[in-house]
Amino acid sequence: MSRMNEGTTARILLVDDHPMMRRGLRDLLELESDLEVVGEAGNGEDAIHLAQQTEPDLILMDLNMPGIDGLETTRRMRDADIDARIVMFTVSDEQSHVLEALRNGADGYLLKDMDAE
């Protein structure tokens, strides 16, 4: 896995089936000069293909997507030797999902805060 050094740009792949979520994340991440969104995917199959093409440092992965879900996508990415850090980014706070994500190769689990404050 490539390690980030001072002065380098982190390459990020966004994986979520909701285009508005991807757009919002992209807009926020691109406010930082050391973060670059290198691709977006709306499903697991496209995510695997893009990860192989773009070789991101970080993948933000939604859990619930049509076709193969984020858990299976993560497992397939690890089986394909995709070594980017994978962080599940989801509304699900079920302990079983957290544990399964980590078992399938995720490096972290981040909750989408959906409460309006």
Where are these regions (language model features)?
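Short amphipathic alpha-helix used as the core "switch/output" element in two-component signaling
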Residues: H49, L71-D83
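Active-site beta3 strand of CheY-like receiver
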Residues: T54-L60
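Active-site residues of response regulator receiver
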Residues: D16, D62, T90
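Receiver (REC) domain active-site loop signature in two-component systems and cognate sites
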Residues: M65
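Acidic catalytic/metal-coordinating carboxylates
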Residues: N43-D46, I68-E72
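Short hydrophobic/Thr-rich beta-strand motif most characteristic of the beta2 strand and flanking loop
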Residues: D34-G42, L50
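Conserved acidic segment of CheY-like receiver
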Residues: T9-M21, L25-L29
